[in-house]
Swiss-Prot record:
This is NADH-quinone oxidoreductase subunit H. The lineage of its organism: Bacteria, Pseudomonadati, Spirochaetota, Spirochaetia, Leptospirales. NDH-1 shuttles electrons from NADH, via FMN and iron-sulfur (Fe-S) centers, to quinones in the respiratory chain. The immediate electron acceptor for the enzyme in this species is believed to be ubiquinone. Couples the redox reaction to proton translocation (for every two electrons transferred, four hydrogen ions are translocated across the cytoplasmic membrane), and thus conserves the redox energy in a proton gradient. This subunit may bind ubiquinone. PROSITE patterns: COMPLEX1_ND1_2. It comes from Leptospira interrogans serogroup Icterohaemorrhagiae serovar copenhageni (strain Fiocruz L1-130). It is found in: Cell inner membrane. It catalyses: a quinone + NADH + 5 H(+)(in) = a quinol + NAD(+) + 4 H(+)(out). The keyword NAD applies.
Amino acid sequence: MNWNEILFWLLKSGLFFFILITACAYYTLAERKVAGFIQDRKGPNRAGFWGLLQPLADGIKFLTKEEVFPVQVNKVMYLIAPAISMTCAIMAWSVVPLGGQIPLPSWLQEKTGLTFLDLQIANPDTGILFLFAISSLAVYGIIIAGWASNNKYSLLGAVRSTAQMISYELPLGMSVVSIVILSGSLRLTDISASQVGLWNIFKLPGFIAFCLFVVAMFAETNRLPFDLAEAESELVVGFHTEYGAFKFALFFIAEYMNMITMSCVVTLLFFGGYQVPFGILEGHVLQPLFGLVFFLGKVLFFTFLFLWVRWTLPRFRYDQLMSLGWKKLIPWAILNILIASIYIQF
C-alpha cells in the first residue's frame, strides 16, 4: 500500500465519520420533531429555518458547558467510560457497506492504484461477527460509568443495562446465524448480494429471524420499550446520571450511532441491503448510485421505527424484559437455526 492509497483511505474514513456524526446530529432533531408531532406540539423551531440549526446549537451548548466532576469519583475511569462507548460505536460502523462498488475515473485509478471505490471503510471476512464483537464491548463503557460515578442510581442503571445487553446478545446473535446459514458468508456485502433474487424477509427462517432481531435490536440499543437502564421514573437517567457537558454528549451520540448502525444492519440482513429490486439496472453504471438511494430509504424507515416506538409504547417491567429474552426469544432462535438448516437442503 503506497502513500496515495493510505491518504485516500484516510480521506474516505474521515468522510464516513463526518457523514455519521452529521446523521446523528439530525437524528436527534428528527426525534424531537416526531415527539412533537405525536404529542401534538411543534418541537424545536427557533434555531434556523424550521429548527434545522438546532443540532449545531446543541453541539455548541455541550462543548461550552462547564466540566464538573462529582465528589469522590474515580476520575480516570469516569473519563474513560464515555470514550469506550463512543469508540465502539464508531468501530462498529466501519464494517457497514452503504452501497456497491463505484468505478473510479482513470486519473484517480493512477493516483490511488484502486479500480473501484468501496462504500465501506473495511470489509473483513468476519464482517457481521466483527460488528457484534465490537458492539458487545460497549458494555464495559456502561458498567465502568456506573461504577466510577459513585452514585447508587448510576450503578443500578449500569447493572441493569449490562444484564439486559448480555441477555439479548444471545437471541440477536442466534437470529443472525440463520441468515449466515442462508447466505453462506459472514460478510455483509455477500449477505446483501445473496438477496438479489429474493430478500431474506420473504423466506421462512428469514422472517422468524427478522422478528427476533428487531425485538433484540431495541433491547441492545436501550430504547423503549426496553430502556430499563435509563428509566427516568426509577433511576433519574441511569448509568450517566452524573455525566454532563461533553462527556454526556459522547454517551448521547454513541446511542444514536448504534441506532443508525442497527438500522443499516437489519436492512442488509433482511431487506436486500443496497440491491436494486427486481434486478433493475443490473450491470448499469448508475446501479451503485440507485442502490445507495434504495439503501438509505430502507434505513430511514427503521430509524423512524425507533422513534415511533419510543413515543408510543410503554416500558416493560424488568422481570418481563428478562423473561422475554430467556424464555421466549432464545428458544425460538435455536429452533430457527434448525429451520434454516433444513430450508437450505430443499
